[in-house]
Curated annotation (Swiss-Prot):
Positions bound to GTP: 442-449, 489-493, 543-546
Ranges annotated as biased composition (Basic and acidic residues): 108-119, 217-227, 237-267
Keywords: Cytoplasm, GTP-binding, Initiation factor, Nucleotide-binding, Protein biosynthesis
Gene that this sequence comes from: infB
Ranges where the record places region G3: 489-492
Species for this entry: Prosthecochloris aestuarii (strain DSM 271 / SK 413)
Protein known as: Translation initiation factor IF-2
Span list, region G2: 467-471
Region spans: Disordered: 102-332
The keyword Aminoacyl-tRNA synthetase is annotated on this UniProt entry: no
Lineage of source species: Bacteria, Pseudomonadati, Chlorobiota, Chlorobiia, Chlorobiales
S-S bonds: none
Amino acid sequence: MSLEEKEMKYRISDIARELQVSPQEVLHFVKQEGAKVASTSSMVKSDMRELILGHFSDEKRLVDQTRKIREEKRQRLTRLEEQSRKTYEKEQQLKDSIAVFPEPGPVLKKDHVHEEPEKPAIVISESEPEVEPEVEPEQPAAAQEAEEAVPTEAVSVPEPVEQERVVPAPEKPEAEKPVPEQSSTMKAQASPEMQVTYEKPKNIGGLTVLGSIDVRSALDRGSESDRKKKNRKKRFKEQADELKGEFENAGKAEGDKKPAKSGEAKTKAPKKAAGTTGSAAEDTTSSKKKKGGKKKKPAVDEKVISQNIRSTISGMDDSSGGSGSRQKFRKMRKIEREKELEAAEAVKEAERSIVRVTEFATAHELADLMGITAKEIIQRCFTLGKFVTINQRLDKETIELVALEFGFEAEFVSEVEATEVFEVHDDSEDLEIRPPVVTIMGHVDHGKTSLLDYIRSSNVVAGESGGITQHIGAYEVTLDNGRSITFLDTPGHEAFTAMRARGAQVTDIVILVVAADDSVMPQTIEAINHSKAANVPIVVAINKIDKPEANPEKIRAQLSEAGVLVEDWGGEYQCQEISAKQGMGMHELMEKVLMEAEIRELKANFSREANSRGIIVESELDKGKGVISTVLVQRGFLKVGDPFVAGNTMGRVRALMDERGRRIKEAGPSQPVRVLGFEDLPQSGDEFVVMPTDKEAREIAQKRQIIRREHEFRRSTRVKLDSIARQIKEGLMKELSVIIKADTDGSIQALADGLMKIHNEEVKVQIIHQGVGQITETDVLLAAASDAIIIGFRVRPNVNAKRLAEKEDLDVRFYSVIYHVIEEIEQALEGMLSPELHEESLGSLEIRQVFRVPKIGNVGGCYMLEGKIFRDSKVRLLREGVQIYDGVLDSLKRFKDDVKEVDAGYECGLNLKGYGDIKVGDIVEAYRIVEKKRKL
C-alpha cells in the first residue's frame, strides 16, 4: 500500500452509501473497533475502510451483484438499440435503391380467359438493340403486378434479331433478396449488359386482352387529395414491408403449384429449361399448365396487393426527382433536431440542479423544490446531526448543506423573487414607440424644479417647503410638437439618496442639472454614479448662465474630471447651456432629449389585453382617501377595477388620478398615475402587477408577508442575542429613541437614512417606530412607554393624541424641512455626549523662601512670575522640571490677609493642601479644567 493510499480518508456516510447500509450501523462497528469518531460525517483512514468492507462483505457482494445485473441490462439494451439502428439503416438503403417505374401499361382482365392466348417469349439479345419508346402493351398481368410491386430501373425493349439464344438467369444481387423470382425485369436488372425482348410466337395459347384499367387516372384521383397524400406518406414504410412479406409468402406457395397466370409460368420457364430452346421451354410451360389445372390458387388477396401497389407507386411519384437528396436532407434535419434537443436538455439539467429558495424555508418547502420527499430531508439532516421536523424552518447554512447532499446548488432569493408572478415576453409586432421617462437630477438649489416649472408652465417650487424638493414628483408633459415626455423630479439633498437611486432605476434618460455659478457638488457626483450604474444616458444641463458670475467652462472641466466628457470637448455626453428662469436654451435641451430617446428606440406593449405592470414611485396616506401611490405604468393599460399585487400588499384599483388630481379612466405605458385602492402602504420601488383575480393577488401577497415576517423575526432575534455581549461590553452607550411619522413612504425612508447616519461610539439614534399618516394615540402611548420623542414630518396629531401627549409631558416636534430635523437631532445627540475636558494654564510662581508656621506647616513665600493665580486654582509643583505634586491650594495670602487672586509681579504666600515638602527653587504652576462641548 502506497503512502498516498495510507493518507487517504473516507467519510463514514459515503462508505455506508457505497455499501447501501445504514450509516449508524457503520458508525457502531467503527466504535466497536476502537476508533474515535463523533458522527457519521467523521473521516476514517483506508485501513479502517478495508475493515468495514470486510465486515459488511455480504452486503458488498449483494451490491456488486446488483450493479452487475444493471450493467448487463444496460449492455443488452445497448445491443438492441444497435440492432434496431442497423435494421433501420438497411431499410433506408432498400428504400433509396427503389427507382421510379415508367408509366404502367394497361392491366389485363382475369375474368375471361381465352384458350389460346398469345405468349411472349423471353430471349436474350447479344447484339446492341434499338431502344423502343414503350413496352409492349400485351404484357401479362402477373408480370405487370410483379413489376409494380418491386420497382426497378426502367428497362428498354429492343427489336428481336436473327440469332438468339436463351441463357440461364444470373444470381440475384444480395440487396434484392426479398424480391419475387417471377419478376423478369428484376433478372434483367441483375445483368446491366443484357436486354430483355418480348416475342409473340404464333399459335401459342394464353390470355386474351379484353379490356384495360386506367391506372394513371386512379392515381391522379388519389393524388388530388392532400389529406390522403399525407396519410400515404406516413404509411409508406409499413406498406412496403407488408408488400414484401406478402410476395415472399406467395412465392413459397407457388413453388410446388401450377402458376395461376400464364405470365408467372413464363417467368419460371427460362430457369427450369436452362440451356434448351424456346420451343422446349414452351412445351414445359404447357405441360405444367395441364397438370396443375385443377389445383387451387395461392391464398393471396389480389385486392389488397393492388391497393398496396398503387399506394407505393403514388408515394414514389410524389418523391420522384431527387429522392436521394431529400432523404439526405431529412437525415440532416433529424440530426440537427437531436442536437438541439440534447442542448436544451443539458440547459434544463443545469437549471434543475439550481434550487431558488428563500432563507428560513421549511423542510417541506425545500423538499418540494428539489423534487424529493420531506422524509428524505429529515433523514439526511439526522445523519448530519440536526434534528428537524417537516414544518421547521431551516437556516441558510443548513439549506446549503442539505442541497449539496442531494446534488443541488442553493440560490437564495427575496420573498418577491420567490413568488414571482409571471415573466413577460412581448412579441416585436406588439411593441410601439412610447414616451421617454426623464429624471432630473442634481445638487440642492441648482435649479432642477425650476427647470421643470418652465417646462410645465407651473410653479412646483411654491408648493415645496423651504423651496426644497422632498418628494419624487412624476409629471407628464406634452411639448409644442405633440411629443410627450414623462419627468421625474428627484430631491437633491443628501438624505434622499435612496430616492435618487429609485429614480435612476425606472428612467430612460437623466438630465443632470449643474449651476454655472457653483461647481460640481457631492450630490452631482452621486447622481452621475447612479446613472452609470443603471446604464442610463446623461444629458447635461448647465443652468443659471444668465448670472454674471456664471462659468460654464469650469463646469465642463469639473464634469470631465468626474468622468462625464461632454460633446463640446469631444466626449459622448450631450450638453446644453440653459437658464430655467429666463427659458434660454430650453427648446434645444428638449430636442436633445428627444433625439436621445429616438436613438434608444424606446418601445412598450400598448395592448389593452396585456396584463399591466408598473413601478411604485411614491406612497402616502391620505386621511380621507386612504393609501395613495404614484405608479409609473410600464406595460399595458391600467384600468379602474383591476386587481393587483404590489410588494407585500394587494388591492383593487378604485380610482386613477393624474398629477393635477383629475380623475382618468386608464393609464398607458410611460404615464404616471396616482392609484387608490391599496390595502396596506407599499414601499417605494415595489413592482406593481395586475392579476387576473383578487384570489390570486391575495395568495401571492400573503405568501410574501409570511416570508417577510419570518425574516424579520429571525433577524431581530439573532441581533438581540448577538448584541447582549456588545451591550455588556459598552455599558454606557446612550440612545436617543425616536418615533417618525411622515406624509409619504419616501420621506420616511429619507428621514430614517439621515438619522441613522448621526452616531458615534457613545450615542446613536434608535428608531422605535415609523409610519405614514398623522400622529395617533398609539404612537403617543408607545413613546411614553419607551421614553422616546415623536417627530412629525409634515403631519399633525389628532385631538386625542395631542391631549394625551400633553398629559404624559412628551416631546413632540413638527417639521416641514428635512434640514431642520437632522440639525436638531444632531444637537440633541451632542447634548447627550460627555463634554471634553481641557486644561487652561493660568500662571506660574517661584518659591523663594520657606516658612515654618505652627499648626499649618510649611508655607512658601513666592514671587508671581507670569499670569495670575486664583484661590480656587489647581496647582502643580515642579522640582527641576519633574512634577512631584498635583492638587489644590489650602490658602493664599498677601502679607497677613487672605486674597482671591494675585497678579504677576507681586509676592504672596501659599501652602499646598495635604503636602508640606516644598523647597526653595520649586516652581508652582496654576491651571484650571475647562469643559468643552463635543460635536458629532
